[in-house]
Amino acid sequence: MEIKILKSESNYLELEIEGEDHTLGNLIAGTLRKISGVSFASYYQPHPLTDKIIVKILTDGSIAPKDALLKAIETVRVMASHYIDEIKGLTK
């Protein structure tokens, strides 16, 4: 995975993430949209034959886009950890 900043402003961030597809894009954008202060979050895959997504984040200024992204990633990490613990606790 390689991440490139395509555009960065005080309330807008656009990233290119190489080596990823809709799986990560949908998870990140969906989580970002639940964060207070995020006005808009989306992603798209420029071409269906490439493993690359573009993520766009727009905030209302109460949170920096990079901070919103970090919060979204931490939320996903905690959620995944919770699911791992739940699955480990299942009995056969």
From Swiss-Prot:
DNA-dependent RNA polymerase (RNAP) catalyzes the transcription of DNA into RNA using the four ribonucleoside triphosphates as substrates. One of its GO terms (molecular function) is DNA-directed RNA polymerase activity. Keywords: Cytoplasm, DNA-directed RNA polymerase, Nucleotidyltransferase, Transcription, Transferase. It is found in: Cytoplasm. It is an enzyme of class 2 (transferase). This is DNA-directed RNA polymerase subunit Rpo11. It comes from the Archaea. It catalyses: RNA(n) + a ribonucleoside 5'-triphosphate = RNA(n+1) + diphosphate. Its EC number is 2.7.7.6. Disulfide bonds: none annotated.
